[in-house]
C-alpha cells in the first residue's frame, strides 16, 4: 500500500499531515508493506472517530482497534522527506500507537537524514540513541539487551510485543514508568547491577530500593508469587494467567 502526499497542502504540520485511517487500511488484507511516497513529511494514524463527525457517530475507538488487528502489514517505509509524526489527539503514531495499529510489524525504515529518529536492529530510537522509542510488535527474537547508551525508555515502547521472552535493562536507563502491557510471552526482566534507579529479582522489576514493584512479566510461568516485605507500593497489578496465588505482606 502506497500513501501519497498532499498537493499544495500548506506550510503547517497539520495541513501537511497525511492521515492513515486504520479502518480503511484494514481493507487491504493481503498487503505486507505500507510505504509513504516522497513528499510525505508528517504522518498520523487515525485510531478513533473525530469528535462531532456525524459519519462516525456509531463508530468507536474499539472498532478502529479491531480493524488494526486485521492488518497484515509487516514493514513500514517512511519517505526520505519524513520529518516526524503529527501529534494529533489520536496519539503519536510512532511513540504511542505503532504496535497497537500494526500487530504484525517486523521492520521500519526511516531515512538516515531524519532529525528525530533512527532505527537500530529493527528497534526505533531517538536520533541520539538515548531514548528507546519503540520495540516493534512482531520483531523476531526472544531476547533483547538495551544498549548502554540508552538513558530512557518510552512508556509504550514494549507494549503489545509478541515474541519477546526476556529483556535486559542496561545500567544507564532511568525510566521507571514503562508499560509492558500485552507482552504476553515476556517471562523475565533483568537489570544491570550497576543501574542506580532500577533493580530486578527473579525476573520481576522494582525500583532500586525494592520498595515499589514496577512490573511482573505477563508470561512468567510461576503459579505463585510472594511480594517482598520491602515493597510498600505497586505501580502495576500482575496480569498473568499462570499465577494462582499472590502473597501480600502485612505492611
PLM regions: where:
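Structural signature of tandem-repeat unit edges
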Residues: 1-59, 69-84, 93-96, 100-123, ...
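Short alpha-helical DNA-recognition segment
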Residues: 62
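Conserved, function-critical positions that sit in or immediately flank catalytic
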Residues: 180
Amino acid at each position: 500500500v502506497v500513501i501519497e502526499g498532499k498537493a499544495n497542502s500548506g506550510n503547517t504540520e497539520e495541513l501537511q499531515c497525511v492521515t492513515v485511517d486504520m479502518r480503511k487500511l484494514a481493507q487491504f488484507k493481503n498487503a505486507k508493506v505500507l510505504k509513504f511516497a516522497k513528499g510525505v513529511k508528517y504522518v498520523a494514524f487515525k485510531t478513533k472517530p473525530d469528535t462531532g463527525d456525524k459519519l462516525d457517530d456509531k463508530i468507536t475507538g474499539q472498532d478502529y482497534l479491531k480493524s488494526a488487528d486485521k492488518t497484515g502489514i509487516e514493514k513500514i517505509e517512511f519517505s526520505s522527506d519524513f520529518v516526524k509524526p503529527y501529534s494529533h489527539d489520536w496519539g503519536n503514531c510512532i511513540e504511542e500507537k505503532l504496535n497497537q495499529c500494526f500487530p504484525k510489524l517486523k521492520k521500519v525504515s526511516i531515512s538516515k537524514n531524519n532529525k528525530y529518529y533512527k532505527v537500530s536492529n529493527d528497534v526505533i530510537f531517538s536520533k541520539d540513541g538515548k531514548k528507546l522509542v519503540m520495540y516493534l510488535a512482531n520483531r523476531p527474537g526472544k531476547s533483547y539487551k538495551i544498549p548502554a547508551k540508552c538513558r530512557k525508555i518510552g512508556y509504550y515502547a514494549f507494549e503489545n510485543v509478541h515474541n519477546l521472552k526476556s529483556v535486559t535493562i542496561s545500567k544507564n536507563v532511568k525510566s521507571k514508568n514503562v508499560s509492558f502491557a500485552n507482552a504476553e510471552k515476556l517471562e523475565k526482566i533483568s537489570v544491570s547491577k550497576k543501574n542506580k534507579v532500577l533493580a530486578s529479582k527473579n525476573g520481576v522489576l522494582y525500583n532500586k530500593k525494592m520498595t515499589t514493584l514496577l512490573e511482573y512479566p505477563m508470561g512468567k510461568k510461576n503459579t505463585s508469587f510472594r511480594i517482598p516485605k520491602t515493597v510498600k507500593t505497586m505501580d502495576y497489578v500482575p496480569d498473568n494467567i499462570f499465577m494462582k496465588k499472590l502473597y501480600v505482606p502485612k505492611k
